[in-house]
Amino acid sequence: MSEMTDAYVKLDKVSKIYGTKEVKIVAVDEISFEIAKGEFVVIVGPSGAGKTTVLNILGGMDQATSGEVLVDGRNIARYNSRQLTGYRRNDIGFVFQFYNLVPNLTALENVELALQICKNPLDAREVLEEVGLKDRLTNF
């Protein structure tokens, strides 16, 4: 990348190719975009456009085949497995479309469980209240 920006997230010519030498599937083809800190962004597109792949790359759950993925000035595209684990644990939050909760724990207990691996855990009750779940703290 040649120019400096104040982007919090920056993808520069990111590609993701799955498959073998004989069969290649290009899931993401040299995409570039920037997101400023605090900016609200929606990723939309038709099925198969690469939305999930891009989110998985940003979330550190998949790695780009090529390009740069900068988050807060750090190129996570160059992270090894251990660094990506730390990034997922300490720097990023992900809400999956099909999430898995521990069924015999309440909403509050599920969040408290996840916070046990955080360096600087937030208050579970406060977090749930902030996302509109104040009345469901004790729901299973």
What do the PLM-derived regions correspond to, one by one?
Residues 74-75, 119-136:
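Conserved ABC ATPase "signature" region
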Residues 68-70, 74:
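ATP-binding/catalytic-site motifs of ATP-hydrolyzing domains
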